[in-house]
Regions:
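C-terminal extensions of enzymes
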Residues: 83-88, 92-98, 102, 109-147
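Glycine-rich phosphate-binding active-site loops on the catalytic face of alpha/beta enzymes
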Residues: 2-11, 56-57, 62-90, 134
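Active-site/ligand-binding-proximal alpha/beta "capping" segment
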Residues: 32-62, 125-147
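Feature representing long, continuous alpha-helical segments
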Residues: 38-41, 45, 74, 89, ...
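Conserved active-site loop/cleft motifs that coordinate metal ions or position small ligands
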Residues: 52, 75-76, 108-109
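Glycine/Thr-rich beta-alpha phosphate-binding loop at enzyme active sites
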Residues: 1-49, 83
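C-terminal helical cap(s) of enzyme catalytic domains, especially alpha/beta-barrels
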Residues: 12-29, 67, 81-104
Length: 147
């Protein structure tokens, strides 16, 4: 059995003139990936069912990160809907190339290597990791901060 975390809910808009729901489809984007990676990494190896990462994966490195966190499968629905089925070949080839370049003999060797259970720096998943980021001053650029 596979469990999909953070599967997207259908979110219709509202037309105030007709007072009716308006169907709309929003693709996932990269900003949605981090929360999913975080929870996959925490749950991998701690729950029995397989874990599927859903939402935010669009690039080969996104799939690498998902597998390293502990996902068994990575859903690429938005990437395929936006770019067509040929995108799957590009992601697969990039994923394979990255694994080869970094010495992974198999997907199984990669899977879960950075999960909370297997990570050499588990504090990165804990509150202390957040405090360290705040203390480091590594913040995204903002227009008002002169970046």
């Amino acid at each position: 059995m596979r469990h999909v975390l953070f599967n997207r809910f259908y979110q219709p808009g509202i037309d105030p003139v007709t007072r009716a729901p308006v169907p709309q489809l929003r693709y996932s984007d990269a900003s949605e990936l981090l929360l999913r990676l975080y929870w996959i990494a925490i749950l991998a190896g701690r729950v029995r069912p397989s874990l599927a990462l859903s939402g935010g994966a669009h690039e080969p490195l996104d799939a690498v990160n998902a597998l390293m966190a502990g996902a068994d499968v990575v859903q690429l629905v938005s990437a395929l809907l936006k770019d067509g089925p040929g995108r799957l070949t590009a992601i697969r080839d990039g994923f394979t190339r990255w694994g080869d370049e970094h010495g992974f003999a198999s997907v199984g060797e990669m899977r879960g290597c950075v999960s909370l259970s297997n990570c050499h720096h588990p504090e990165g998943f804990e509150r202390a990791g957040y405090v360290n980021v705040l203390q480091s001053g590594r913040f995204p650029a903002t227009p008002w901060a002169g970046h």
